[in-house]
Structures are given as structure tokens and as C-alpha cells.
Amino acid sequence: MARRIYRFIWNRRLSSWQLQQGLYAIGQATVARYGADELVVAIDPVNFEKPYPHDLEGVSTVHKSCPPDRKGKARLARGYPALTACVVNLPEPVVTYAQWFSYTREFLSENVELMQAITTTRQLYPEHPLCFVADSG
């Protein structure tokens, strides 16, 4: 599905909001098709490294453990933090939230992003009991 979305990124007639709404509609149709009683939603903060970030807007310093440095330790790299929420108890995953962000002046906190992921997921699936899970990392 990502390949289909990439061709729309530079299309000025299609906004990121419209892409997200389409992604959410696909997710809602998938959940309805499987008829799950409860949804288990994994919330995953990740860091994306950009190899040549010199001209990119809002690039941040992120903590990367994969691949490690020469000593096998985590390292600092240039890139973007992101947060995803995904239904994981169906035969196919369903994205309920996906957001890249940057540590700029406008950025409030990662906790605000976490709350937005939970709020968005609750708005998309108000009739389903939700169980949110995350790792301790």
C-alpha cells in the first residue's frame, strides 16, 4: 500500500489530510470485514534516520540503536522521530495513527503525540473496546 501512497505525495491537488482520511477509511473497512470484538492497538515510537539531511526542513537529532556504531552501542543520527499506532490482532494490520514530527519550536512533546494517537484511534473505532499496548523502550 505504501507504493500506492508515495505517488500522491507531490500531488498539489491532494493534501496529507485527504491521504490520512483514505488510510483511515481503509482501516475501518478492514476492521468491519473481520468483525473483531476487541482491538489491540500497538503504539510504537520510532526514529527514522535520513542519510543526507542537509537540505531537509526540521531535521532533528534522533537516537538510533540499529545499526549500532563500531562499538556496538546506540548512536545519535540526523532524522525524524515518528509515532505509529496499529491494530495488531487481525489477520492484516490496520494503521490508526502515523505521524512524523520534528523537535522545532512548534513541537509540544512526544506525550502530546501519544495522546493524539489514542484520541484518533478512539474516534475511528468508538464502538470497539480498545486495548493499547507499547514496549518499554
Describe each PLM feature range.
Residues H54, E92-G137:
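Single, function-defining residue in the core of a domain
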Residues M1-R7:
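Short, basic interhelical loop/turn and adjoining N-cap
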Residues R7-I9, G35, P81, A98, ...:
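Compositionally biased, intrinsically disordered low-complexity regions enriched in proline and serine
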Residues I9-P93:
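Active-site-proximal, Lys/Arg-enriched surface segment
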Residues F8-W10, S15-L19, W100-E110:
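Short flexible/disordered coil segments
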